[in-house]
Structure formats: structure tokens, C-alpha cells
């Protein structure tokens, strides 16, 4: 390729002066991205939190509405004492915790860390419940 001579030219346009950019950058504060934890970190934190507490996980009023709705389908005009609903809730949560423990064991046996519907079905079959 042939060489060509460079000639001096008068600057017309081009980049803006550097100090003007600095003024523009500092006029608006930068938006901070929200921090994201690695996948699984928040789940492990929640597991540890709920294992420490003995509180009920399901809220009382939604559970009470569910009990009344199921009872309404069986027989009309049934009323429940507060203690009866809380005893039902305690038993339901104890059953669910045990069920999820067995389900987790089934998933671990299959060399998985994620539970699947087939794990619940296997846990119910091993417990003797109907599928």
C-alpha cells in the first residue's frame, strides 16, 4: 500500500472538552443496583430461621377461613371454638412438617436437592397413606 502524506487540518468538531464531561457526570447521582444474593442463600437463611422458631407458619385467619369453608361443605351451621381451630392448625402443620421431612429424604435418596411430586407420592406410599 502506498504511503500518503498527512496534512495539518483545522479542528472542526470532534470530542467535547473533558471538563464538560465531568460536570455532566456529577450532576446526577449514579443509580445503585440492588444487591442479589447467590441462588440458595436466602432459602438456607429461611430454613434456619423457621427451624429456630416454634411459631405457626400458616396465618391464623386464612387457616380459620379454610376450615370453615371445608366444614360448610360437610354440614351447614357448624361453629368452632378458638382452641379447636388452633389445635387443628397445630396438627395440620405438624403433619406437613413430617411430610416434607420424609419427602426431603426421598429426594436425597435420589441424589437430588429439589423435591418433586414423585417424592411426595413415594413418601405417602411409604407412610401407608393413600396416593
From Swiss-Prot:
Expressed in roots, seedlings, leaves buds and open flowers. GO terms for cellular component: nucleosome; nucleus. The modification N6,N6-dimethyllysine is found at residues 10, 32. The modification N6-methyllysine is found at residues 10, 32. It is found in: Nucleus; Chromosome. The modification Phosphothreonine is found at residue 12. The keyword DNA-binding applies. The modification N6,N6,N6-trimethyllysine is found at residues 10, 32. The modification Phosphoserine is found at residue 27. GO terms for molecular function: DNA binding; protein heterodimerization activity; structural constituent of chromatin. The modification N6-acetyllysine is found at residues 10, 15. Keywords: Acetylation, Chromosome, DNA-binding, Methylation, Nucleosome core, Nucleus, Phosphoprotein. It comes from the Eukaryota. SUPFAM superfamilies: Histone-fold. Its main location: nucleus. Core component of nucleosome. Nucleosomes wrap and compact DNA into chromatin, limiting DNA accessibility to the cellular machineries which require DNA as a template. Histones thereby play a central role in transcription regulation, DNA repair, DNA replication and chromosomal stability. DNA accessibility is regulated via a complex set of post-translational modifications of histones, also called histone code, and nucleosome remodeling. Belongs to the histone H3 family. This is Histone H3-like 4. It comes from Arabidopsis thaliana (Mouse-ear cress).
Amino acid at each position: 500500500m502506498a504511503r500518503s502524506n498527512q496534512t495539518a487540518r483545522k479542528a472542526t468538531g470532534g470530542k467535547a472538552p473533558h471538563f464538560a464531561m465531568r460536570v455532566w457526570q456529577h450532576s446526577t447521582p449514579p443509580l445503585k443496583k440492588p444487591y442479589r444474593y447467590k441462588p440458595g442463600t436466602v432459602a438456607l437463611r429461611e430454613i434456619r430461621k423457621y427451624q429456630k422458631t416454634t411459631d405457626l407458619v400458616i396465618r391464623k385467619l386464612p387457616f380459620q377461613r379454610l376450615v370453615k369453608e371445608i366444614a360448610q361443605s360437610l354440614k351447614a351451621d357448624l361453629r368452632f371454638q378458638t382452641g379447636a381451630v388452633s389445635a387443628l392448625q397445630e396438627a395440620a402443620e405438624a403433619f406437613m412438617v413430617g411430610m416434607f421431612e420424609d419427602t426431603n429424604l426421598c429426594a436425597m435418596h435420589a441424589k437430588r436437592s429439589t423435591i418433586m411430586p414423585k417424592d411426595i407420592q413415594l413418601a405417602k406410599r411409604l407412610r401407608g397413606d393413600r396416593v
